[in-house]
């Protein structure tokens, strides 16, 4: 009986066709300002095919998204306070 070795992920970027809509997740990441760090994670995964070797890139992306979420939350709170002050 032979043992098969599990293959790593095949991480590839799809090429966007002109008539194809952009993926909502890609849109979200682009709007977040974290596209460069997300791309770094994708590049690392394509090169190493092992997420454990990409932890610095994953952490940088996580930090970027956390900062973006905090800024968004602050902006929403500020808008709610302004709306409440006008009433």
Curated annotation (Swiss-Prot):
A motif (Cx9C motif 1) lies at residues 34-44. A motif (Cx9C motif 2) lies at residues 54-64. Signal peptide: none annotated. Residues 69-81 have a biased composition (Basic and acidic residues). Keywords: Disulfide bond, Mitochondrion. Induction: Up-regulated by estrogen. It is found in: Mitochondrion. InterPro entries: CHCH, Coa4-like. Disulfide bonds join 34-64, 44-54. Residues 1-25, 68-87 are annotated as: Disordered. One of its GO terms (cellular component) is mitochondrion. Residues 1-13 have a biased composition (Polar residues). PROSITE patterns: CHCH (PS51808). Residues 31-72 form the CHCH domain. One of its GO terms (biological process) is mitochondrial cytochrome c oxidase assembly. Putative COX assembly factor. Belongs to the COA4 family. This is Cytochrome c oxidase assembly factor 4 homolog, mitochondrial. The lineage of its organism: Eukaryota, Metazoa, Chordata, Craniata, Vertebrata.
